[in-house]
Amino acid sequence: MLRSLIFVFCTAMGIFLAVVQENYKRTLRFSFSAFVFFLVPLVFFALSRFFWADAAGLADYHNYFDFFNHADKVIENRFEVMAKVIRFFSPTFFLFLLSYSLISITLKVYTIDKISIYPLLSLVTYISTSFALHDIVQIRISCAIAIFLFSIRFLVEQKYLIYVLFISIAVCFHKSSAAFFIFLFFRKNSFHPAFWILSLIVIHVSAFLNINFIKLFLLVLGEDNYYYLSIISDMNQNLDLFNVNQLINIFIFLLLAFNSRKFISYKFFPIFMKIFFCSIAVYPLLNSVPIVASRFSEMLRPSIIFLLPLVINIFRRKWVGYIFFICICLMLSFLNNFYYSLVSI
């Protein structure tokens, strides 16, 4: 039932915010009251797991509940610290969920307001794509992603020490966040579409030819490393490199890449495009380790929150761009909430 509400909420908000965005200046930013107006319902939906989890059978909810009540027995020390800090103020599990939701959603909405060209449309994209999966189910990785998105402006402004500090904090929420350090080595102020499009083609062709990038890399380190990794890989099904979600993401990336000159003035465009590229490329690159590929793809995909709204500038008639944008958002929302059933509530 809740996923139906999210879908209806996304549809209504998408149409409403698109109209509002078009009728105000592009420099439109959230006032404090507007910030709270958007924040409260999102936090409410995120906290709904507290009331619906038993009926929905949310495994993640029950795992977090057990971890919270037995923090000293949790394998991950970072989670133990977070749980004990929250338990110091209150032993209630609801406060634990509220803390994670406030950290994650507040940072995301704040970042959208500060660095998105179309903050309202970015908000719609956020609700359509990563909100249900991350803020309702994967709450630790959601906080890590929120901190990563918040730190992007420091990366672009070449304040690397601050960026490293925030990513280190993100690692405290989820160790997979260490992958975000790699973007320190990316050029932040330029994007060459031909290079990245060609790279995307080469990577997928190589995967189609069954070239195992993980094996090639681990052979340098020693065969034993690949042996253990192959055991993990054998326990999982191979990824569908051209599933519907992946195809939509490739289409959006190519659409933006071919029209990249129109977004040259948006200083965050180059780095977000490269992050989005990585979210797509990680599937064929890490296809032999499906769990790892899916995890990293999910972590990097929220970059679409800031990129998808830009498509309205591609069309000569703005209203066509808005219709196209809303259709893509509804399609992604339907795929995430119903087709793939990422949140079975």
Tell what function each PLM region has.
Residues 294-310:
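Hydrophobic/aromatic-rich transmembrane helices and adjacent perimembrane loops
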Residues 109-128:
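Transmembrane-helix signature of polytopic, membrane-embedded enzymes
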Residues 1-2, 18-101, 335-345:
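TM-lumen/periplasm interface segments of multi-pass membrane proteins
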Residues 197-201, 316-335:
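Signature aromatic-anchored transmembrane alpha helix within multi-pass, membrane-resident enzymes
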Residues 136-142:
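Short acidic/glycine- and proline-prone juxtamembrane loop motifs at membrane-interface regions
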Residues 33, 55-66, 71-80, 184-296, ...:
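Alpha-helical transmembrane segments and terminal signal-anchor/GPI-anchor hydrophobic tails
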Residues 148-162:
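Membrane-interface transmembrane helices that cradle and orient dolichyl/undecaprenyl
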Residues 162-186:
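Membrane-interface alpha helices of multi-pass inner-membrane proteins
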